[in-house]
Amino acid sequence: MLDNLKLLFVWAPIINVQIILDGIFVGAVFALSAYGLALVWGVMNIKNLAQGDFVIMGGYLALTLFHLSIPLPIILLIVIIIMFVFGWGIYLLVIRRIIDQDMFVSLLATFGLSLLLQQVLNLFYGPEVKTIDMEMGGIDAFDGMVTIPNSKILSLILAAIITIAVVIFMKRSRMGQAIRATAQDPRAARVLGIDTDKVYAFTFAFNAALCGAAGVLVAMIWVIQPFYGITYSVRNFAIVTAAGLGNLPGVISAAFGIGLFEKYTGMILGTAYEVAAPVSIL
């Protein structure tokens, strides 16, 4: 540990540039699914333990489409649509029945959904780790001490575009306004003529679509595996806990913060502690 600290701040401080960049790339992906969780939690009071599994599912859908030689922008669009429909279906089958139930009911239901998705993905894709091999090259700086894969740059750009689209949608669209009104006071929203059941269904489907988009980016720059969903669920809960519900700027800031925290933890204590770092926030 002491040697790693010396490496960071005395012998090779330029490594901090690599860690900060990696933290930014990580945070951009985390922010998408974390905001979806914040919406579902804030609007419906559902703590979705299957959140990370939605991300992994989106990654596997992207991997399948990539093997069909479909261009990446089209893959992203298709995955978002499929996950939106999937999320709406899960709402009708499961979530709709537990909205007004005790918190532990929602935790048990979504935990069961998480286990089901893990086993289905394992059945279809196997337990091996997989990734989308973009073969895009990268940028080397500071005599090779800092490496930036072009796939990570692309993922950051795509995450920024999606985030801007979400901000515009939530502020300008009627459904976005209905979601915010329902989050503030569901009864008042119903009095004003808002179909809260439709808002709930759309919110959960929208969350699944954001997870799907995050999954595409995860498959591009890391690896996916059927049982990795729990790690993303923990990260999302840590981000939402730090940022608060329905606060997109806060979610983005917390996502970048946790991304940096993870990378520095991995560098100082070892990669075995990297994924465990967000747990300290909960």
Give the role of each language-model region:
Residues 4-5, 97-172, 198-202, 264-272, ...:
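Transmembrane helix-bundle core of multi-pass membrane transporters
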Residues 26, 145-225, 248-253:
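Helix-loop-helix "hairpin" substructures at the membrane interface of multi-pass membrane proteins
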Residues 37, 70-113, 120, 253-258:
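Alpha-helical transmembrane segments within multi-pass membrane transporters and channels
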Residues 70-81, 204-211, 215-280:
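Transmembrane alpha-helical segments in multi-pass inner-membrane proteins
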